[in-house]
Amino acid sequence: MKDLKDLNLLDRFLFAEAMEDPQNMRDVLEIILGKDVVLKHLPQTEKEARISPAYRFAKVDVWAKDTDEVVYDTEVQGTNTKNLPKRSRYYESIIDAKLLKPGERDFNKMNDVYIILIAPFDLFGKRKYMYTFEMTCKEDPSVSLEDGATRIFLNTHGENPDEVSPELVELLHYIEHTTQDMADGCKSERIHKMQKRICSIKSSEEVSVRYMQRWEEMEMEKEAARELGLAEGRTQGLTEGRTQGLAEGRAEGRAEGRAEGRSSMARLIDKLLEENRIEDCKRIAKDPEFCQHLMEEFGIE
């Protein structure tokens, strides 16, 4: 467990704590988008979103809306889970599903939406700091769909500083290395002020207690998920072992089945924990079809 003082803004806890301050949220959005942003409400951190109880929920890092009714979902991602483009699509879909009131027929009343993901790796391999995606026509790229949806992927390791603002480059470096030395090396006055506010967060006893509680809760949830996963793995392994044993010998089949079951389930649990999908970890022990669906999602055999 890292000390609170050693966290950077790529750590979800510190990012959420920092973005609860509307000035931090506003500064980050303005630097990324290169335009003025006036927030209508206080940012909401770790906002749960679910289309219906039958489907999995998503927890967006920071949700905000401006006075033009534009919605912003801003996420940080420390590791490449190989599914971020489709995850951004999923987040956009569940946000869209809640934008219109029941019975509303005018789809033009849907808010514009920005899905912004900040990561310390280059998702697309083009060495850019920023990748912005909007719908255009494949046959004629000059034709824009203008559906109001924008997805932005930011790479803290970009190599094209001439194509973005110097302040954005400084912000991305600061997000990855949230230290006084890094802030001192920035020319941006907004980053200097942000660093002062984040220093206050890191020195807050109240925030320190919340951080410890969050860590303890996550450790307990992970342990419970592992236990459930191991139980499911044993059951699945025994079943596979019995089936295989009919053809290859019961003893050998059961042993191999148990080993393969535990191995596959362990890999699935590791993948889910990497994405903090604790609820999915709990569900796989009770829902074999859902478990198989996740195995296919992550390409686990």
Where are these regions (language model features)?
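Elongated, amphipathic alpha-helical interaction scaffolds
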Residues: 1-301
